[in-house]
Amino acid sequence: MQESDVFHNQLRVEMLKKEEDEVENNSEKKKAPGIDMNKVNLIKTRDEDIIAENIKAELKEEEKENMKVEEEEIKEEEEKKEKENYPCMQIIDQEGIFADENQKDRITFEEFIQENTKFKELGFNYNMLSILGPQNSGKSTLLNYLFDTDFAVLNEKNGRQRTTRGVWLGLVGDRKDIIIMDLEGSDGSIREDDLSFERKISLFSLSVCSVLMVNIWSHDVGRYGASNMSLLKNIFELNLQLFQKEDSPKTLILFVIRDRDQRKPFENTKSVLLEDIMKIWESVARPECFKRAPIDKFFDLEFTSLPHFKHDKELFIQEAKELKKRFDCKNQNTYFRPIYNKEIPADGLALFTKQVWSAIKSNKDLDLPSQKEMLARFRCDELIENIFNEFEKEIEEIKLQHSEKHIFNNFKIFCDCLYDKKMKEFMNVASKYLDRVVKEKADLLSEKMLNEISYLFQTQMTLAINYIKTMLTTSYFTLKNQYITEQSSLFDPTKYAGYAEQMDDFNSTIKNEWEKISTQSVPSNIENNFEIEINTLDRFINKLYEIGRRDLIEALMTHFKKHLQNIMKPLLLPLFEQSNQNMWEQVRKVVIETTSQNLQELENGMINSLKMNKDDVEKKLNELQVYIIDAVRSTILERPGFVSNLMENKFISIFRLDDEGLPKKWKQNEDLSKPFFKAKEEAEKILDLFSYIRMDPKDDELSFISINPATGKKMIIEEPENGTIDQTKVLFSLSERLSIYEGFQNMAESNFIRAQQELAAITVHSKTPMWLILLIAFLSFDNIVYVFKSPTLLALTLIIIGIIYSLNKIGYAYLIDSVISYILSISWSSVLYLIQDLGLFKNLLPKPEAPKRKRPQKKTQDDKPKSSILLTHKKQPSVMGDVTMDNIDSLNSFDDAFKLVSQDEKPIRKPLHPLPKRETQSMKVMPMSASFTKSQSMFIKRNPTTTSSLNKIKEANEF
């Protein structure tokens, strides 16, 4: 109840009270004597009760009326709001212009659909209805009552004129799943006889609508012109033009007969109308294949009627509401049956209608299948672009990690899920379009996404393989450096157990990591073009483990060898330095003693620490002889020039020193060849001893110095004549032995020449005649007097004489003789060279000509190397480098393996321990002694005895 009504009721009660008060006052004034006041009061009370009851009844009635008014107002507001929720727009104006982006003064059909997002998601689950009929026949009014739309209706005050211009469209229904099209009237006076626009909009509605509603007045039924049967003929002809396939959807034509005549049975009207329809159908020109086709092959016909809108409005509204129920899809008797659906996707309706109207307007042959195909292609391309852009945004995360050289975790799952998700999104929308086009476009989208995934897969696998290679490099080389460093400590086989466990852990960890990465990095929908690399890396990991195990065993054996060497070295070096003839017998004894003490420790280390089986242990123990030989060899070769020094010491000890170890004093006319050859022969025996490691007693009989049968002279041979040799026991090769012997030969000749000089000095000093001494004293008398007069020169002369006397006393007179001989043998040419070097008499001496240098000639154009014109395209290097399934088995070391994998990624490593130098590195040919100069050559020429002795030496040493 409203406030105004309450106020009026209160006012009425107050007025009644005032009236009662006035009645009481009047009654008291007019009260006559003898009147019973009790009766008066009783009457008064009864009247008041009656008045109160009447007031209450009136108030209740007013309250009911007010509530009813409120309910009607609320209902009107809800209906108004509901109508406002059903938007309408003009899709085609009276000029035939479609509502697209070119029209700035009204909303486009695409924007209209975009605003109604629920409609876009319907797919095929919507229906379209259009109404045709004469102008001002109440089409818009009927639609407004049936679907609660708000189409403009006729205002009779303005006269009968065109109300609906062009084609209007409304979106209605609880789910906004019904599109209503209100078409312009067909017999308007404005267009007169121009039926082209009427035909075009009819064709347009027929191509998109599943239900055509034909509005006909009841009094026009049976009249061809008045009932607008020509429009119906157009519909039949256009339908045959559009839908000629067997599977084309039917169209429902609903005839609504308006202003029904209550006196005339509806069945009679229906039969008359149906008879006219059949006549029109028979008169329609049909293709040959449809000459005898009945009308129900293309159309379903329904008939209904409504009473007069003005004369019987309440009944009209009531029957309109009943008719409205037939447009509810939930109703079993609904007009919107699935067989009538034109199967135009909701999200592509705007584009489809635009294309259809464009073809109709330009009077082109309207091919609906082609239009649907065009729509499908356009929408699918649009979908592909949007979905692929979203796809690229989502894979940016992978690209970011790849750019930072990181492997993307769960690459396979991510790519598979993303691919399936995007394909599902595409199919959810595109499946409503033409299957053939959808399949083609789905393949295109799939190809685009798989190309991107394939590129990412290439990067992922490259990073994964490089990551595993880095793990291999870091793990194995770090471990190798550790157990190589271990070799510098005391030999303890138990320490190698930890290295073996680490290697097993590395191998299992790398294998598991690689298996995890490889299985999680290969998407399901792409071709795995890394199968070769994956299989190669699998074998490469196994091969590196084999190399690592082998190197670890070799490291243990090498450590044992160094251990043996450290034990044997103090015992072997004295034997090698003595170089006795039974040296190798003593060496074998030392080796047997040291090996037997440590062999059990090595065997336990291989079994317990390295987990080697007995066969491999037995095999390694059998190879122990090689390690012993290497230990002996290392002991000898670790001292550069060891054998050369032994030979030189042996030669000097025999040839230059006496039994007490003092330098020999040569006697006049002493024969130097005998001690020389004896010393040389003993030194040669040392070379023969160290030519071969004789760990077998049978090897003692081998000799590497033989007599040349042709010349009868000694020669060094490659292999002994009295037996075969084991190349692993050869200490020096033939070239190395020849180099050692050549150096020894030069040293021996130098010592022999020095001995010859000493012997010659003694001979010259003893053969100087007295008269020569007196002659020199006589000729030098003035100088002698000058010396005696000069205290300085006299003191210097006395000092020199004292030094010479002292040297002569202690046995170094031969040095003085050598100096004197050297001074006497200096030639004038030497004097001239000395003067020239000192810069004396520069102007008198001839200037030596400087050698002319040949200037390098400039290269001409013809001299330049001609480059090849053909440029070969370099093949992209494999991720695995040069490693293949064929050459993996040939790998023998980590260096070889990682060199083949990638030279760029190979770590730069420095050797932890310098290798022992070979003997030949320090065995350069020894030059002649510094004293053996031109003067010595002249001296030898003046002494035929010396010359003949030297010639004998050279003949004996020829090979």
From Swiss-Prot:
GO terms for molecular function: GTP binding; GTPase activity. Its EC number is 3.6.5.-. It is a multi-pass membrane protein. The chain crosses the membrane at residues 768-788, 792-812. Residues 789-791 are lumenal. Residues 62-81, 849-868 are annotated as: Disordered. Keywords: Coiled coil, Endoplasmic reticulum, GTP-binding, Hydrolase, Membrane, Nucleotide-binding, Transmembrane, Transmembrane helix. Residues 9-86 form a coiled coil. GO terms for cellular component: endoplasmic reticulum; endoplasmic reticulum membrane. The keyword Membrane applies. Its main location: endoplasmic reticulum. The keyword Transmembrane helix applies. GTP binds at residues 133-140. It is an enzyme of class 3 (hydrolase). InterPro entries: G_GB1_RHD3_dom, P-loop_NTPase, RHD3/Sey1, Sey1/RHD3-like_3HB. Residues 1-767, 813-959 are cytoplasmic. GO terms for biological process: endoplasmic reticulum membrane fusion. Residues 123-340 form the GB1/RHD3-type G domain. It is found in: Endoplasmic reticulum membrane. Belongs to the TRAFAC class dynamin-like GTPase superfamily. GB1/RHD3 GTPase family. RHD3 subfamily. Probable GTP-binding protein that may be involved in cell development. PANTHER family: PROTEIN SEY1. This is Protein SEY1 homolog 1.
